């Protein structure tokens, strides 16, 4: 029994010593004869890639047309493209010329370089105003119309003799003359200000000489009183 009980303890002791012992030194030549040496190459493959396939739809050959028809169609397309480019260039030049004919404020400049006048242009120019957009430099130099132009436009739109609808209605409804409506607080303030001005009117009428004379008299009386008090104290 004692020997059987001692055997597990000996096994545990030997296992503990086995774990505690250092491993054997690494030998790179020990496993060379056990199997073939494998080399993994991650570079580009040396085999050529598979041939390119265009697919089932593109693999069908397209029958070529005759050389004469192809050249004629190409010439027609190039001629139409040249005509379209010429028309675009012509329209662009016309728009530039129209933009140069107008002043900085979008008004038609006079030939004598006078201040800008109101826009008086032929119908064809006014029709193309939206198409002739200004450039960046012209937009940056854009200025509002002058004060004289604004006053002239307002005077032409509404004459000075004509009255507004509200003014006409007010003149028609007004019968006899009525005094203007005054707020009670404003009336009280005005009366108090008038009363205060009337109370202080004599002093303002006397001027600065009366006030100075009064102060001088008070000063002399005060000096006399002080002298009398000092004399009596001694």
Swiss-Prot record:
Region (Disordered): 1-104, 158-182
One Pfam family this sequence matches: Herpes_UL56
Entry's Gene Ontology cellular component terms: host cell Golgi membrane; membrane
UniProt KW Transferase keyword: no
Record field: transmembrane: 211-231
Extent of Basic residues compositional bias: 85-99
Membrane topology value: Single-pass membrane protein
Main subcellular location of this protein, as a coarse class: host cell
Keywords attached to this entry: Host Golgi apparatus, Host membrane, Membrane, Transmembrane, Transmembrane helix
Effect recorded for residue 52 to A: Complete loss of interaction with host ITCH
Compartments reported by the entry: Host Golgi apparatus membrane
Annotated motif PPXY motif, positions: 23-26, 49-52, 144-147
Classification via InterPro entries: Herpes_UL56
Quaternary structure, from the entry: Interacts with host ITCH; this interaction induces ubiquitination and probably degradation of ITCH. Interacts with host NEDD4; this interaction increases NEDD4 ubiquitination. Interacts with UL11.
Family under the similarity heading: Belongs to the herpesviridae UL56 family.
Domains as described in the record: Late-budding domains (L domains) are short sequence motifs essential for viral particle budding. They recruit proteins of the host ESCRT machinery (Endosomal Sorting Complex Required for Transport) or ESCRT-associated proteins. UL56 contains three L domains: the PPXY motifs which are involved in the interaction with ITCH, a member of the NEDD4 family.
Role of this protein: Plays a role in the transport and release of virions form the host cytoplasm to the extracellular space. Relocalizes host NEDD4, a cytosolic E3 ligase, to cytoplasmic vesicles.
Protein name: Protein UL56
Organism field: Human herpesvirus 1 (strain 17)
């Amino acid at each position: 029994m004692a020997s059987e009980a001692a055997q597990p303890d000996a096994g545990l002791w030997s296992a503990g010593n086995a774990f505690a012992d250092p491993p054997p030194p690494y030998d790179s030549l020990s496993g060379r004869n056990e199997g073939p040496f494998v080399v993994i190459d991650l570079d580009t493959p040396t085999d050529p890639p598979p041939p390119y396939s265009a697919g089932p739809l593109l693999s069908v050959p397209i029958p070529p047309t005759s050389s004469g028809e192809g050249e004629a169609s190409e010439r027609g397309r190039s001629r139409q493209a040249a005509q379209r480019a010429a028309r675009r260039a012509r329209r662009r030049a016309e728009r530039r010329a129209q933009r140069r004919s107008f002043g900085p404020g979008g008004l038609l400049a006079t030939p004598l370089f006078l201040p800008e006048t109101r826009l008086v242009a032929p119908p064809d120019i006014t029709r193309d105003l939206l198409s002739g957009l200004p450039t960046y430099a012209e937009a940056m130099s854009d200025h509002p119309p002058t004060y004289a132009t604004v006053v002239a436009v307002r005077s032409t739109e509404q004459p000075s003799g004509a009255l507004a609808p509200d003014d006409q209605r007010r003149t028609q409804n007004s019968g006899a003359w009525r005094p203007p409506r005054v707020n009670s607080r404003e009336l009280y303030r005005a009366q108090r200000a008038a009363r205060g001005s009337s109370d202080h009117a004599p002093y303002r009428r006397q001027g600065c000489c009366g006030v100075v004379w009064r102060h001088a008299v008070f000063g002399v009386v005060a000096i006399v009183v002080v002298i009398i008090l000092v004399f009596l104290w001694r």
